[in-house]
Every structure is written in structure tokens, then in C-alpha cells.
Regions:
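Active-site rim/loop-helix segments in enzyme catalytic domains that contact anionic ligands
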Residues: 1-95, 224, 234-236
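Metal-dependent de-N-acetylase/amidase catalytic core
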Residues: 2-6, 82-238
Length: 238
């Protein structure tokens, strides 16, 4: 199965918080999108691996994602080495995405930066034909995505470009709210975390609104990229 976009997140909810509006918009345009979570988020202060799996499944259904998988790397302790790279290479070759989305290059949670570099390195290595992989006993062809884009998360990283998600902010927040174990709940007895603070979800909306303000729209999501972005014409710029 070939996908147009394959989004990776170190934890379930990373992709939704960083790029769900963009994903919803691309799906509305007929693009196929998949999400692969690197870990189950089992070290998270709130919820559990089982609960987060259920929440990820709900978010998948809300967004209309084609596939969602979890590589079950060790939360907090996965590293950028050959074994982990090979698992991601197999997925890239299986789904042959044109575009890969992944974690912010630098962020509060150490897994985000680690995951970002791991996925980026795997995208490059996946294009080398002398690295051999198989799927169900059949050799996989080398495949390198055209581009890797990093969504912005906790830190206020200056984006290289932004995507207008006006009209898709509700879809984004519905997908985010699928992860109810992670966010503010006045009835919860679990410890408070930076994202379970009662003001956190408002900050997600405020950031999208501020990025939208920069381009004269209601809402936007920001991304950084590893090469200079190009447009076919000056008139393609908003």
C-alpha cells in the first residue's frame, strides 16, 4: 500500500498536537495519510499504554487516517541506532510516502528530538539499495521520501513555513481531545503534568491562531524542514 504522507510521532498524541489540522486538510484533498507511533507512551505520568492505544485508535477514526501502527520502541530509552533505524526503514519502504512528518528537532521531551533525528536518518538510509529489507519474505525496494517536515511541539520554534488550517481547527482539536487521559480533568486523581494543566489546550488553539495571524488566516500549523522549501511561482505564496 502506498501512502502520500506518513507521519511519525515518538508518542501517541504527538502527531495530533503538532500536525492534525494539516493532516485533516490533506485528507480532505484526497491524500492518503498514515501515522506510526514509535512508542506506546508507557512512561507517561497519566493513563497507560492500553488506554493510549484506545485513544490513538479513536483519533485515527476521527481523522480518517488510512493506517496507524505502533513500533513499540521503549518509551524514554529508544536510541538512534541500526536496529531502530531498520524498523523505520521497513515501514518507509512498505508505504512509500512522498512526504514524511516527524517530531520537532528540539523540544522539552527528550524523545521528541531523538525521534526526529531517528526518523530523518532512516528516511535517508531507506533510499540506499544496498541496505536489504524484506516484508513477508519478499525483498523491499529502496525508497526515499521527497521531503521530511518537522512539526512544532512544545518549544516555540520559528517555522520555515506554515500551513493554513482554517476550517480544520475543529478536526484537529477533536483528534487531540481523543487523548482524554493526558489532558485536564477536574475529576482525575493522577498527578498534574505540563499538558494536563487546565490552560494547556487553550495554548494549542492560541498558537494555531497566532501562526494564522502571521499569514492573514484564522489558524495555521508550523513546520521546519531540512532543505530550502521551493515554490513553482511567486503566486503560490499566500
Amino acid at each position: 500500500m502506498k501512502l502520500d504522507i506518513l507521519a511519525f510521532g515518538a508518542h501517541p498524541d504527538d502527531v495530533e498536537l503538532g500536525a492534525a489540522g494539516t493532516i485533516a486538510k490533506e485528507i480532505s484533498l484526497g491524500r492518503s495519510v498514515g501515522i506510526i507511533d514509535l512508542t506506546q507512551g508507557e512512561l507517561g505520568t497519566r493513563g497507560s499504554a492500553e488506554i493510549r492505544h484506545q485513544e490513538a485508535t479513536k483519533a485515527k477514526e476521527l481523522l480518517g487516517i488510512t493506517i496507524r501502527e505502533n513500533l513499540k520502541f521503549r518509551d524514554g530509552f529508544f536510541i538512534n541506532n541500526e536496529a531502530h533505524q531498520m524498523e523505520i526503514i521497513k515501514k518507509i519502504r512498505q508505504y512509500q510516502p512522498e512526504i514524511v512528518l516527524c517530531n520537532a528537532v528540539d523540544d522539552r521531551h527528550i524523545d521528541h528530538g531523538k525521534g526526529s533525528k531517528l526518523v530523518s536518518d532512516a528516511c535517508f538510509l531507506s533510499g540506499l539499495r544496498r541496505i536489504e529489507t524484506t516484508l513477508d519474505g519478499v525483498a523491499q525496494a529502496a525508497w526515499r521520501p521527497k521531503v521530511v517536515y518537522h512539526y512544532i511541539q512544545w518549544k516555540n520554534i520559528v517555522p520555515d513555513f506554515v500551513v493554513d488550517i482554517t476550517g480544520f481547527m475543529e478536526a484537529k482539536m477533536n483528534a487531540v481531545l481523543a487523548y482524554s487521559s493526558q489532558f485536564y480533568d477536574s475529576n482525575s486523581n493522577e498527578p498534574t503534568t505540563p499538558i494536563s494543566d487546565k490552560n494547556f489546550l487553550d495554548s494549542v488553539t492560541y498558537r494555531a491562531r497566532d501562526l494564522g495571524r502571521l499569514i492573514g488566516t484564522d489558524f495555521a500549523e508550523g513546520f521546519t524542514c531540512e532543505r530550502v522549501p521551493a515554490v513553482e511561482s511567486l503566486f503560490n505564496l499566500k
